[in-house]
UniProtKB/Swiss-Prot annotation:
Record keywords, A-Z: Electron transport, Heme, Iron, Membrane, Metal-binding, Mitochondrion, Mitochondrion inner membrane, Respiratory chain, Transmembrane, Transmembrane helix, Transport, Ubiquinone
GO process annotations (BP): mitochondrial electron transport, ubiquinol to cytochrome c
Tagged with keyword Transmembrane helix: yes
SUPFAM superfamilies in alphabetical order: a domain/subunit of cytochrome bc1 complex (Ubiquinol-cytochrome c reductase) (SSF81648), Transmembrane di-heme cytochromes (SSF81342)
Functional note: Component of the ubiquinol-cytochrome c reductase complex (complex III or cytochrome b-c1 complex) that is part of the mitochondrial respiratory chain. The b-c1 complex mediates electron transfer from ubiquinol to cytochrome c. Contributes to the generation of a proton gradient across the mitochondrial membrane that is then used for ATP synthesis.
UniProt cofactor note: Binds 2 heme b groups non-covalently.
Database matches in Pfam families: Cytochrom_B_C, Cytochrome_B
Compartments it resides in: Mitochondrion inner membrane
Cofactor: heme b
Record-given protein name: Cytochrome b
Positions contributing to a ubiquinone binding: 193
Self-association state and partner proteins as the record states: The cytochrome bc1 complex contains 3 respiratory subunits (MT-CYB, CYC1 and UQCRFS1), 2 core proteins (UQCRC1 and UQCRC2) and probably 6 low-molecular weight proteins.
Length: 371
């Protein structure tokens, strides 16, 4: 069958025999995307994009709609699993030098930004306390743009404050962006199949390739099954694991929560934003925390593609992971000592990875050439 059908034969390409479990996260991300789109569709059927009815419509979905609680919890927990998979996927790309496949990496970075935008718009929709205030804080960052900032913010809000028009357009954007993500995911996969996948050794896989199906397709199915099992376990036993307690109260513009914070998957970027006392500087740092990923294909200096055989670069990589976790943790804390200093130090270390990595590559090259 795969040999006969052109669509199947073009997608089930031979792959290097030694690709590890870290290569399964692409298919897991596609599963998450399918799950989020389908559950989101059923939620959109019952949701009302009105500031007076949005919170009530969420309660209606949970209590009155048959299996509405399943759809709502799958969608909320699925978003967290989506980001767990995408961050692992990016970390794998950094570790094994997959960013050298430039167009795949750049399209992936755009996908990440689209996904973050979609998740942000979705977080506003329940119109709970944290939804409202997170939207207020993040959209307010647009005012930091010189000259046009205030006009741009008013245009986005559809008025002089976050109100009914804001919720309506956020719902429209949250509905349409996943289809853009699906389209760009297709481009991402086509670009990957253009050059083929890399492997843990960073060597040319052409000398030892095996059919994708059944060898790697079953491996993909195993990891996807584990992920879906984990999703259902969380949904059954701890459905509110990733939810903020503040969001169980309806949005009140007159009462500010003690500590405004977005969902956990935005905390590292939010932590970098908060660590800089200047509004414009913080906004630029927030953007750069994601945009800096686009520099890696152009700053790779090592003769060796993967970090598998580069112990010093491995140390640098795991420092980056520890820094990412530290920034995420500090962003959950109030803006007071010692968290301000920890956050600032961690932010400097985060960005310095992308500067030290090329320098370390040159040093390694020099060391390998000396006898």
């Amino acid at each position: 069958m795969p040999n006969q059908h052109p669509l199947l034969s073009s997608n089930l390409l031979p792959v290097g025999s030694n690709i590890s479990t870290w290569w399964n996260f692409g298919s897991m991300l596609l599963t998450c995307l399918a799950l989020q789109t389908s559950t989101g569709f059923f939620l959109a059927i019952h949701y009302t994009a009105n500031i007076n009815l949005a919170f009530s419509s969420m309660i209606h979905i949970l209590r009155d709609v048959p299996y509405g609680w399943t759809m709502q919890n799958l969608h909320a927990i699925g978003a967290s699993l989506f980001f767990m998979c995408i961050y692992t996927h990016i970390a794998r790309g950094l570790y094994y030098g997959l960013y050298m496949n430039k167009w795949v990496w750049l399209s992936g970075t755009i996908l990440l930004m689209l996904l973050m935008a979609t998740a942000f718009f979705g977080y506003v929709l329940p119109w709970g306390q944290m939804s409202f205030w997170a939207a207020t804080v993040i959209t307010n960052l647009l005012t930091a743009i010189p000259y046009i900032g205030t006009t741009l913010t008013t245009w986005l809000w559809g008025g002089f404050s976050i109100n009914d028009p804001t919720l309506t357009r956020f719902f429209a954007l949250h509905f349409i962006l996943p289809f853009l993500i699906i389209s760009l995911s297709s481009v991402h996969i086509i670009l990957l199949h253009n050059d083929g996948s890399n492997n843990p050794l960073g060597t040319n896989p052409d000398i030892d390739k095996i059919p994708f199906h059944p060898y790697h397709s079953y491996k993909d199915m195993l990891m996807t099954t584990i992920m879906i099992t984990l999703l259902f376990i969380i949904m059954s036993f701890s459905p509110d694991l990733f939810n903020d307690p503040e969001n169980f109260s309806k949005a009140n513009p007159l009462v500010t929560p003690q500590h405004i914070k977005p969902e956990w998957y935005f905390l590292f970027a939010y932590g970098i934003l908060r660590s800089i006392p200047n509004k414009l500087g913080g906004t630029l740092a927030l953007l750069m925390s994601i945009m800096i990923l686009t520099t890696t294909p152009f700053t790779h200096t090592s003769h060796v593609r993967s970090m598998t055989f580069r112990p010093f670069t491995q140390l640098l990589f795991w420092t980056l992971i520890a820094t990412f976790i530290t920034i995420t943790w500090t962003a959950t804390k109030p803006v007071e000592p010692p968290f301000i200093l920890i956050s600032q130090t961690a932010s400097v270390i985060y960005f310095s990875f992308f500067i030290i990595n090329p320098v370390l590559g040159l040093i390694e090259n020099k060391a390998m050439m000396t006898k």
